[in-house]
């Protein structure tokens, strides 16, 4: 699952001062609906990377965005809408959806029906899912954590980081 001939982690680690490890996009725009960065898969990627290199120059990449898939999913046809995690929470409120938390993936999601009565599923990140990723980065002795698409901000991320970590601008 995580081993790949596409990336030589050991060589990349030696050649770079820091490596931003993309551990997300398990759920993606054209893919089947699922968590964007489910913790078991994130852990597996890290375990593989750490089996061939040390963690002191690795930053765990974490997403700050959401995907909204219309259902039923049709391979090659269904395309998820992308927006911020903050917008995902606002949409849940707007449509009256109950946000659930998948304990295995350690990611929030919800279902709703649009005006055309078509069902949707939304997966995103929140303080709980980010906290799990921050804890994993600390557990594995990584250099830190980095966010992808910081322009699609999640207001919960900054106080959480402030409380749990010493921030350093690179």
Language-model region placement:
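Glycan-binding loop/region signatures in secreted carbohydrate-active enzymes
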Residues: 3, 64-135, 165-170
């Amino acid at each position: 699952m995580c081993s790949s001939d596409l990336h030589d982690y050991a060589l990349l680690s030696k050649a770079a001062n820091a490596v931003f490890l993309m551990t997300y996009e398990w759920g993606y725009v054209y893919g089947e609906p699922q968590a964007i960065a489910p913790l078991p898969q994130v852990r597996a990627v890290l375990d593989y990377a750490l089996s061939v290199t040390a963690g002191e120059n690795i930053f765990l990449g974490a997403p700050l965005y959401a995907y909204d898939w219309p259902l039923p999913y049709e391979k090659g046809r269904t395309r998820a809408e992308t927006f911020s995690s903050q917008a995902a929470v606002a949409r849940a409120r707007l449509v009256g959806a109950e946000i659930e938390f998948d304990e295995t993936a350690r990611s929030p999601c919800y279902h709703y029906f649009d005006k055309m009565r078509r069902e949707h599923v939304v997966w995103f990140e929140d303080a709980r899912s980010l906290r799990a990723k921050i804890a994993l980065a600390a557990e594995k002795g990584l250099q830190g954590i980095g966010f992808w698409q910081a322009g699609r901000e999640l207001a919960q991320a900054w106080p959480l980081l402030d409380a749990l970590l010493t921030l350093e601008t690179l």
